[in-house]
Amino acid sequence: MTDPAMWDVATLSTAFGSGSLSPVEVLAAVRARIAAFEPTINALVRHDAATTAALDRESALAAAQSEERWRRGEPLGPLDGIPVTVKENLARAGVAMQGGCAGATPVVPVRDSPVVERLREAGAVIVGSTTMPDWGMLSSGVSSLHGITRSPWDPALTTGGSSAGAGAAAVAAYGAIHVGTDIGGSIRLPGTWLGLVAHKPSFGRVPLDAPYLGRVAGPLTRTTADAAVAMSVLARPDDRDWTALPAHEADWSVETASVRGLRVGLWLDAGAGMPCDPAVRAVAESAGRAFESGGAVVEEIQPWLTPQMLADIDLFWRVRSLVDFE
């Protein structure tokens, strides 16, 4: 694999440390991929010319500063020089946020979100904010503000949502790590539909500002190891989130991980909504057998969701979206 935009974090960091590659060169490779893919997939939030130029200068400076740190042998952290993206609803100081909605008034944050602060502290180079559907309340990449975000595998297909741009950017290799948010599937749907590693952490594990009941931030990556190193950074504490779990130093590495003895629930029938497609059910059953072969204890979960519960959940989300809009 000769295109460094496709490399994982460990490979990039090794190359930076040896001096065989620089963060500046990797940023250039990522920008080349953005220029090639973006007219089709529409994964990044578009800004006016002045803002775009300013953000390009910011990322170029971050890459140059990282290059100098690596030259001195003093990287800031595990993501120094690594190109990343963040979902539009994760604040970047001075970058307008509109929640994917053309009818919303843009909000310009004065401070980076906890996620963005942790990434910068670790030396990451932020190459852009990724698109989302209106208020993040749609399982596709269709937005009244951004238009349609499309799958790099096949532009005729949806990315899933609401971390639509994050998923598309990950497949197109706009960097190694792409941070999305998730309440009811917004990281996991793009991850599943696009063939990525998608991790929804426990509520409160990754600090947010402001915290939002049920919402978490987590990584979309092309490798499990990259998701693990992303979590080692994103899960660091921030006192702005009063719902955060107590800080702890977890070992996020996966090299020696085993599923032996792990309890795995296999949910094949939701009990409400659309029935599961037979082909999808077959894949889920195959995954269950794979876990069993690795020593996990797999148990089928019986349906618990009712049509009334689903209707109530839908009403709840509609009301929350109305509050966001107002």
Say what each PLM segment does.
Residues 1-61, 293-295:
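An N-terminal boundary/leader segment
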Residues 23-28, 113, 251-252, 276-303, ...:
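Acyltransferase
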Residues 43, 239-245, 292-304:
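Flexible, glycine/charged-enriched surface loops at secondary-structure junctions
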Residues 53-64, 123-124, 133:
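Long amphipathic alpha-helix in the N-terminal Rossmann-like dinucleotide-binding domain
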Residues 66-82, 257-265:
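Immediate post-signal peptide segment of exported/extracytoplasmic ligand-binding proteins
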Residues 78-115:
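Enzymes and membrane/adaptor proteins characterized by extended Gly/Ser/Thr/Asp/Glu-rich
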Residues 111-234:
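Short glycine/serine-rich loop segments
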Residues 200-288, 305:
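A short helix-breaking turn/cap at a secondary-structure junction
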